[in-house]
């Protein structure tokens, strides 16, 4: 997702109209491939896992498939509908919770083997660092956070209380978007920004598109970090 829309994406209502664009991006994207590989190598069945801001279940579903018991926390009704649709045949072992991360008391979160959040903590009303602190305060055995680095607010502690970082990786990940037409790229820009582009902006959008096969592609990438902490007694 483009940096320009992170603040707009912090409201569940944003996703009511954005879900089709998210689905289209996911259909052609390999953004999560490395993330899934790492998280499924860390987790062990039958771990209890909480996925904060689960979206369409891109991380929850592989964990359920390997035998974990997953609570998918997703406050957007549109994204929950998508999650239920895509997890229709993989629901055993998954519980979908409509609450926001801010709405849950830490005392209700005891007993998790892993709490994970992928590009979701900065979308909370309390902000990235307080949301991360709340994960540690919930006392899971392990914490995994995936985040893009687009703001000075995104700061990653090596230690927090009795948690120590056990794994860290930062890499450039392709996040390109495929469109069926150049006009569709302009529509997507409008969905991102909440306004229609001017003539020069429209021309600039179209000038960045490259034709490959049946699609017009907008090249993009993101600096993505994956961090894992483990609790030590």
Residue ranges of model-derived segments:
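Conserved beta-strand signature within the Rossmann-like core of class I S-adenosyl-L-methionine
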Residues: 140-148
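Short conserved loop adjoining the S-adenosyl-L-methionine
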Residues: 103-110
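Class I SAM-dependent methyltransferase SAM/SAH-binding core
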Residues: 56-103
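A conserved beta-strand element that flanks and buttresses the S-adenosyl-L-methionine
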Residues: 116
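Conserved Class I S-adenosyl-L-methionine
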Residues: 56, 171-233
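A short, conserved alpha-helix within the catalytic core of class I
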Residues: 123-135
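Conserved class I S-adenosyl-L-methionine
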Residues: 1-43, 46-55
């Amino acid at each position: 997702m483009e940096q320009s829309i992170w603040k707009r994406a912090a409201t569940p209502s944003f996703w009511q109209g954005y879900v089709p664009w998210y689905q289209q991006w996911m259909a052609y994207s390999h953004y999560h491939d490395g993330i899934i590989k790492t998280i499924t190598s860390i987790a062990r069945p039958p771990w209890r896992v909480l996925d904060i801001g689960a979206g369409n279940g891109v991380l929850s579903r592989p964990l359920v498939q390997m035998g974990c018991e997953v609570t998918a926390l997703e406050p957007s009704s549109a994204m929950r509908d998508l999650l239920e649709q895509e997890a229709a045949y993989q629901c055993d072992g998954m519980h979908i919770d409509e609450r926001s991360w801010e709405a849950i008391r830490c005392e209700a979160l005891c007993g998790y083997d892993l709490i994970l959040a992928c590009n979701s903590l900065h979308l909370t009303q309390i902000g990235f660092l307080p949301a991360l602190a709340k994960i540690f305060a919930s006392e899971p055995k392990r914490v995994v956070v995936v985040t893009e680095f687009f703001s000075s607010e995104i700061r990653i502690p090596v230690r927090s209380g009795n948690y120590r970082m056990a794994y860290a990786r930062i890499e450039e990940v392709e996040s390109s978007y495929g469109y069926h037409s150049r006009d569709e790229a302009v529509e997507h820009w409008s969905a991102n920004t909440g306004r229609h582009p001017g003539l020069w902006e429209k021309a600039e959008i179209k000038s960045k598109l490259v034709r490959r096969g049946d699609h017009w592609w907008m090249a993009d990438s993101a600096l993505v970090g994956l961090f894992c902490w483990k609790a030590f007694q």
